[in-house]
Regions:
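N-terminal amphipathic/basic-hydrophobic helices that include classical n-h-c signal peptides
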Residues: 1-23
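Boundary-proximal intrinsically disordered activation/regulatory segments immediately upstream
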Residues: 17-85
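RNA substrate-binding interface of SAM-dependent RNA methyltransferases
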Residues: 27, 72, 129-226
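Short, aromatic/basic amphipathic alpha-helical patches
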Residues: 88-99, 256
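A glycine-rich helix N-cap at a beta->alpha junction
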Residues: 98-115, 199
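Structured adenosyl-cofactor binding patch, chiefly the S-adenosyl-L-methionine
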Residues: 122-124, 162-166, 180, 184-193, ...
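Active-site/ligand-binding-proximal alpha/beta "capping" segment
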Residues: 219-272
Length: 289
């Protein structure tokens, strides 16, 4: 994404403050208890990250490409953790952002801190943006995707990537859906969770009237005796469509199915009853584009 540029050093080979980007505060990691490093500690502890990141108003962006997309979306960095050889690239990427601390260390030090091999070179602790009202997110939208209680972060990230790549306008997620800004979701989405407009929905008792009032036809993707096939539905797609996807284990709730104007299914063969929800989202979005 950016031409590789080595870190600035003094005559003795020590990393020094870069004069071209004076607002970047470079801190060489010589102690894992340095203030600010808690944001990156034990990244492999899934339960801890789920509890700590949202509560702290932060999310973790991994790789220079994802960090660049976060910055382009206007998300403010709190700090960056980077391997020495990628410091030059990160300094140029952060140009114009005031008072950003960049923690620098070798691969072994960063792995000791985070709990895994930082093969993508950089992490950033980003301040979470405030969630927008549903009405703002769906204003002007023609195709939206609704995720109900999908708790697998990989699936959430893959669905966002499909939404961005195939061209839906927004994503709405249920109160119990996995966090799109969890590190794995962001990574799997290739940073598209930072581009696609999204927010959380209230419960269906409020969400369905809200979507209907905005003119959306609610189509639930599910296995049902009353379902129409995807091809049948695609023959006459409503002008404003909300496509609802559920978890692979339990599927959609009774409330979601009751709220739907149409239940749609993807016909399968060879004894397979359904696709992975992320794959199903891509098939449905492409067919209904």
């Amino acid at each position: 994404l950016f031409p590789h540029r080595p870190p600035a050093t003094d005559g003795a080979g020590r990393i020094r403050q870069n004069e071209e980007y004076p607002t970047v505060n470079i801190v060489r990691i010589d102690d894992l208890d340095l203030p600010g490093l808690d944001d990156y500690a034990r990244l492999t502890d899934v339960v801890l990250r789920r509890l700590r990141e949202p509560a702290g108003g932060l999310y973790i962006a991994e790789s220079s490409k994802v960090i660049a997309r976060a910055l382009a979306a206007g998300h403010r960095p709190r700090s960056v953790l980077v391997q020495e050889q990628w410091l030059g690239d990160m300094e140029s990427l952060l140009a114009g952002w005031d008072d950003v601390t960049v923690f620098v260390g070798d691969a072994a030090t960063l792995e000791s801190l985070t709990g895994y091999n930082l093969h993508r070179g950089a992490l950033a602790a980003m301040h979470r943006p405030e969630l927008r009202p549903v009405a703002d997110v769906i204003q002007g939208a023609r195709r939206i995707v609704v995720l109900e209680d999908i708790t697998d972060h990989t699936n959430v990230g893959a669905i966002f990537r499909a939404v961005a790549g195939i061209g839906a306008d927004a994503v709405l997620i249920s109160p119990r859906c996995a966090d799109p800004l969890y590190r794995r979701s962001v990574r799997v989405s290739m940073g598209t969770v930072l581009q696609v407009p999204w927010t959380r929905l209230p419960e269906w008792s409020e969400a369905a009237p809200l979507l209907h009032a905005a003119g959306f036809h609610i189509a639930a993707l599910a296995l049902s005796e009353n379902a129409v096939t995807l091809d049948e539905f695609a023959a006459d797609v409503p002008s404003k469509l909300a496509l609802v996807l559920g978890s692979e284990g339990d599927g959609l709730s009774r409330q979601a199915l009751s709220a739907a104007d149409t239940v749609v299914t993807i016909p399968m063969s060879h004894g397979v009853d359904s696709l992975n929800v992320a794959s199903a989202s891509a098939v449905a979005l492409y067919t209904l584009r």
